[in-house]
């Protein structure tokens, strides 16, 4: 995370160099740890840093529906003791607030909405955090170009 931009901000005489993006990436990493299924033989925790984002993959499937995760407010941790321990040392927010924290940070930057992908065949979950506006604009342009054709089709 060292190459993420850090603004110069002072609170009194102390420099504050953590941004909502830093907090969101850390939250993604914490979620990777507390929601992993460590009993799976084939599973491995994986973090990939790209020039334009991050990808976090952990073994196990989601314990809540995607819609509920995106909405926030609920958590069903696979490793609640680990979650409690991390919160006690200052990592992680209130239960159920982590994913909305990520969504808010990305929305404020105008970046592509974070994508949570559940692969039930490989039994793994991947969080994709793209730090770009491109895909968002491409989707918008595609929708605008095809708006009329979508309106005409009735299913």
Indicate where each model-derived feature is located.
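C-terminal regulatory or interaction extensions
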Residues: 1-155
């Amino acid at each position: 995370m060292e190459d993420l931009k850090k603004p110069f901000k002072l609170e009194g005489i102390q420099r504050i160099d953590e941004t909502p993006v830093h907090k969101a990436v850390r939250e993604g990493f914490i979620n990777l740890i507390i929601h992993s299924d460590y009993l799976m033989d084939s599973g491995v925790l994986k973090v990939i840093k790209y020039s334009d984002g991050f990808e976090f993959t952990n073994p196990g499937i989601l314990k809540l529906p995607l819609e509920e995760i995106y909405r926030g407010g609920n958590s069903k941790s696979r490793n609640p003791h680990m979650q409690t321990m991390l919160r006690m040392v200052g990592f992680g927010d209130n239960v159920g607030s982590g994913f909305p924290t990520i969504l808010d940070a990305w929305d404020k930057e105008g970046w592509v909405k974070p994508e949570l992908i559940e692969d039930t065949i490989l039994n793994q979950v991947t969080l994709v955090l793209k730090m770009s506006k491109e895909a968002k604009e491409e989707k918008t342009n595609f929708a605008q170009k095809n708006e009329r054709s979508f309106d005409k089709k009735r299913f």
